[in-house]
Swiss-Prot record:
The active site is at residues 65, 108, 201. The gene is Mcpt10. Belongs to the peptidase S1 family. Granzyme subfamily. One of its GO terms (cellular component) is extracellular space. Pfam families: Trypsin. GO terms for molecular function: serine-type endopeptidase activity. Residues 1-18 form the signal peptide. Residues 21-243 form the Peptidase S1 domain. Duodenum, lung and spleen. Residues 19-20 form a propeptide. Keywords: Disulfide bond, Glycoprotein, Hydrolase, Protease, Serine protease, Signal, Zymogen. It comes from Rattus norvegicus (Rat). This is Granzyme-like protein 2. Transmembrane segments: none annotated.
């Protein structure tokens, strides 16, 4: 299905990460075929407001704070202002974590059931999830991708990506009481200045081809590191919830 996508910035709460890749680069077109653009209807058009990623043919994972009504999911996009051979879906069920806390953003994870199964091809693919015992270690460098603002605050129509270093949990704990290393990741080296920002929420933090984190929040405006949801902790919940979503 062809879709002409017009990107407009959505307004999100201050502490959430909603499409900004700072000091990153443009992704090779369709090199991250698991990426999803989440759009919701605002005014008289659909607007990109969060990222997500395909974990099964009809299931997209994202952040719980990205929950909106009338979500459209776009798969197979690179330039969201050009006509591309994308697949467009309505969401029939949204399942945020039942213990999601909108203040601390603890348990900031959600699964979306699509209206039909995606057709997997060269530009639309699923991404692997970690095992429950897999923990990303401080010093490891992984990648986040998203659509939106660049370092100069201009809007990008193309998918951007940036490599970010995992930090020790103490660094985030020292900046905020609302950090729990068992369910969250502390990401981004302050000395490098690379970051995620508005519009990237819900996108995957990918380490060696595995989605290890979900872009969640920043500790305070303009600061590093960022806080991501640690996916491996939620594997039992993910497995249980995917089974529930597959039921008629």
């Amino acid at each position: 299905m062809f879709l002409f996508l017009i990107f407009l910035v959505a307004v999100l709460p201050v502490n959430t990460e909603g499409g900004e890749i700072v000091w990153g680069t443009e992704s090779k077109p369709h090199s991250r075929p698991y990426m999803a653009s989440l759009m919701f209807y605002y005014g008289n058009s659909y607007r990109h407001y969060c990222g997500g990623f395909l974990v099964a043919k009809d299931i997209v994972m994202t952040a719980a704070h990205c929950n909106e009504s009338n979500i459209k999911v776009i798969l197979g996009a690179h330039n969201i202002k050009k006509r591309e051979n994308t697949q467009v879906f309505s969401v029939v069920k949204a399942k945020p974590h039942e213990n999601y806390d909108s203040h601390s953003l603890f348990n900031d994870i959600m699964l979306l059931k699509l209206e039909r199964k995606a057709q997997l091809n060269g530009v639309v693919k699923t991404i692997a999830l970690p095992r429950s015992q897999d923990w990303v270690k401080p010093g490891q460098v992984c990648t986040v991708a998203g659509w939106g603002r660049l370092a100069n605050c201009t809007l990008s129509n193309t998918l951007q990506e940036v490599n970010l270093e995992v930090q020790k949990g103490q660094k985030c704990q020292g900046m905020s009481e609302d950090y729990n290393d068992s369910i969250q990741l502390c990401v981004g080296n302050p000395s490098e200045g690379k970051a995620t920002g508005k519009g990237d929420s819900g996108g995957p933090f990918v380490c060696d081809g595995v989605a290890q984190g979900i872009v969640s929040r920043r500790l305070c405006t303009g600061t590093l590191p960022r806080v991501f949801t640690r996916i491996s902790t939620f594997i039992p919940w993910i497995q249980k919830t995917m089974k529930l979503l597959q039921q008629p």
